[in-house]
């Protein structure tokens, strides 16, 4: 359980097509996140699943 996101680790996450932070949501905790941002990105919610570095999104480029 991540203190910044009240859903279990590995929980259900969804991200809209282009993956812009404002449109990405953790479906189970309803907090904004960006699943394709690299670990440590301050602009994105902590505790959310992230894709590989080759799939960076514009919000954290």
From Swiss-Prot:
A divalent metal cation 2 binds at residues 7, 15, 26. A divalent metal cation 5 binds at residues 34, 36-37. Residues 1-29 are annotated as: Beta. GO terms for biological process: cellular response to cadmium ion; cellular response to copper ion; cellular response to zinc ion; detoxification of copper ion; intracellular zinc ion homeostasis. Residues 30-61 are annotated as: Alpha. A divalent metal cation 4 binds at residues 33-34, 44, 48. A divalent metal cation 3 binds at residues 15, 19, 24, 29. A divalent metal cation 7 binds at residues 57, 59-60. The keyword Protein biosynthesis does not apply. The modification N-acetylmethionine is found at residue 1. The keyword Transmembrane does not apply. A divalent metal cation 1 binds at residues 5, 7, 21, 24. Keywords: Acetylation, Metal-binding, Metal-thiolate cluster. GO terms for cellular component: cytoplasm; nucleus. Signal peptide: none annotated. GO terms for molecular function: metal ion binding. Disulfide bonds: none annotated. A divalent metal cation 6 binds at residues 37, 41, 44, 60. It comes from the Eukaryota. Belongs to the metallothionein superfamily. Type 1 family. Class I metallothioneins contain 2 metal-binding domains: four divalent ions are chelated within cluster A of the alpha domain and are coordinated via cysteinyl thiolate bridges to 11 cysteine ligands. Cluster B, the corresponding region within the beta domain, can ligate three divalent ions to 9 cysteines. Metallothioneins have a high content of cysteine residues that bind various heavy metals; these proteins are transcriptionally regulated by both heavy metals and glucocorticoids. This is Metallothionein 1H-like protein 1. It comes from Homo sapiens.
């Amino acid at each position: 359980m991540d203190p910044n996101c009240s859903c279990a680790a590995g929980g259900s996450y969804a991200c809209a097509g282009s993956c812009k932070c404002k449109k990405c949501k953790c479906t189970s905790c309803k907090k904004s996140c960006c699943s394709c941002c690299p670990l440590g990105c301050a602009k994105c919610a902590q505790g959310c699943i992230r894709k590989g570095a080759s799939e960076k999104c514009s919000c954290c480029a």
